[in-house]
Amino acid sequence: MGEHENEGTLILDATCAPQNIRFPTDVSLLNEARLNTEEIIDELHGIGAFGSKKPRTYRQVAKNQYNSFSKSRKKSKKMIRKAMRQQLGYLRRNLKMIHATDKKLREELSAKLQERLSVVEVLYAQQKEMFEKGTHRIDERIVSLSQPWVRPIVRGKQNAPVEFGAKVEMSVVNSYLRIEDLRWDAFSEDTTLQTSVESYRRCFGHYPAHVLADTIFRTRENLRYCKEHDIHISGPRLGKRPADLSVYHEQLREE
């Protein structure tokens, strides 16, 4: 325990701060990446990277195919796979042409295009792997080319099972809100409880008497920690609910 008697209540909760990005789909991301590579090819051609003849990119064909797909109201899995295969093919061809140029000439690209090229390369590798494996999950998945640090955060809500933005853990003490943790990658809230409590102690000179938090915070390690510091943490006991529901409801009332 701390030097002083525990006082106050610490409320903990986590949420996602939605980022202002277009809802990502595999086909739309690949189409945007293709457009980016076409812009890069145009700039490289302007500085003589391909000689006098500009290479063919089939951009009009690729554009027509994407527009035809995007205008379809009902997109079957077969249609999505076909559109992805098409855009992956054009993107692969464009990247191959870009990397066939002199590296010194590529370094003459604007800083913005050089940065975008590196993001497009990662996106292509991710999308190719997911397409070949028939999955929609991959580590560090890019969902926005302009904001490549944004990650999908699984929330499990009925209307928004996945959100895109920073995950934020917050605390409330005496009606004041404080950000305890903010990350662009998904993290489990239970790992932040102890650091939040210790932050409370440094701020107020003592531990809180109560911690109010969702069930996810009530891990065995966190319960042990709270017991060790004489902190009451809200919520039902771990384990299976009692067969007698009246006992379970009594536990909730006590909390």
Regions found by a protein language model. Give the residues of each.
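Anion-binding and metal-coordination hotspots
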Residues: 1-255
